[in-house]
Design a protein with these regions (language model features):
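Conserved Rossmann-like nucleotide-cofactor binding loop
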Residues: 60, 205, 230
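NAD(P)H dinucleotide-binding glycine-rich loop of Rossmann-like/cofactor-binding domains
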Residues: 76, 87, 106-200
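Short glycine-centered segments of the SAM/dcSAM-binding site in methyltransferase folds
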Residues: 196, 294-295
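Cytochrome P450 core scaffold surrounding the K-helix E-X-X-R motif
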Residues: 62-68
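Adenosine-nucleotide cofactor-binding segment
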Residues: 196-202, 214-283
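Helix-to-beta-strand junctions that scaffold the AdoMet/dcAdoMet cofactor pocket
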Residues: 290-292
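Glycine-rich beta-strand-centered segment in the early N-terminal region that forms part
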Residues: 40-57, 72-120, 124, 165-167
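N-terminal Rossmann-fold NAD(P) dinucleotide-binding loop
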Residues: 86, 206-207
Length: 296
């Protein structure tokens, strides 16, 4: 089995962090703890598990941050090392194509009765991701027992598998996981018709969020903050009414909502802000552009 394996190696992690800071995103992988290795395939943890042969696996923003040493160590206790990255996966099980829902909740961990979150169907908020018969791991791609998409083989619980229709290409199917995250965020925001929605960030999740907003046809206006020219073009193509560079989002929202500025805050602002960056700076920006009693 060929696999890219991320090991727990603090000196290499620090080196990758320094390299990415000096040379830019993606440069840390050359000196970081990721290695291409030959290894034994992961064992099936139980009878409800199957082996999956990945066909395509995505490179998530969280994967890039991990490889560049920029990810927070806050989640280290719910990750087990060494692990094979890759949680956006389309693959084959006995000739049938599937996508993987990566969360390793109570069902996958053999925990009965399930925690309150899993019992209500909110498996993404599982309270037992470090317990059960698996090593700790928020999801496939961060658990040493399951393997991940950056390999020839991984194992998955039957509850994680969803069939891929013949009409969907592998390239489209590998986007199911990030698209589902975006759709979930849009639905959870309970956006009212005619609302102004600001989307901060135009990476994969940000662009999927813009597309989800327009597909559901709820907001009156979508304002997207995008760093790079190609992201700005894609955001507009996917339905954003107004697209601004990160430093111009407040001004754009102010004009759209006809708000006034008091200090660095708006008197009005967007009804809903969806933060697709997840940094301290983006949270601060979200609070600056949302209206009083709005939603972030």
């Amino acid at each position: 089995l060929k696999a890219l394996v991320f090991e727990r190696n603090l000196p290499r992690w620090a080196a990758s962090r320094g390299a990415s800071a000096l040379a830019g995103t993606g440069r840390g992988v050359r000196v970081g703890p990721l290695r291409l290795v030959d290894m034994e395939p992961p064992l099936l943890p139980g009878p409800e598990w199957v082996s999956v042969r990945p066909t395509l696996a995505g490179i998530c923003g969280s994967d890039l941050a991990t490889l560049d040493g920029r990810s927070s160590r806050y989640f280290e206790d719910v990750v087990s090392f060494p692990f094979v990255p890759g949680h956006e996966v389309v693959g084959e099980v006995e000739g049938s194509r599937v996508v993987i829902e990566p969360v390793l909740g109570c069902a996958a961990r053999g925990i009965v009765p399930p925690c309150s979150a899993c019992a209500q169907g909110h498996t993404g908020s599982c309270e037992r991701v470090a317990f059960g018969h698996l090593q700790p791991g928020l999801q496939t791609g961060y658990c040493t027992d399951t393997g991940g998409g950056w390999s020839n083989t991984l194992v998955a619980h039957h509850s994680q598998l969803h069939p891929v229709p013949d009409s969907m290409t592998d390239e489209a199917a590998v986007m199911v996981e990030p698209t589902a995250c975006a759709v979930h965020a849009v639905l959870a925001a309970d956006i009212q018709e005619g609302s102004t929605v600001a989307v901060l960030g135009a990476g994969t999740l940000g662009l999927c969020t813009v597309a989800a907003l327009r597909h559901l046809r709820l907001p009156g206006a979508v304002v997207a903050g995008a760093k790079h020219p190609e992201q700005r073009r894609l955001a507009a193509d996917l339905g954003a009414d107004l697209v601004a560079e990160p430093g111009q989002v407040r001004r754009t929202v102010r004009r759209q909502t006809r708000s006034l500025t008091v200090g660095d805050r708006l008197t009005g602002g967007a009804d809903v802000v969806i933060d697709c960056v997840g940094s301290a700076a983006s949270v601060e920006e979200a609070l600056a552009v949302v209206r009083p009693a709005g939603k972030v």
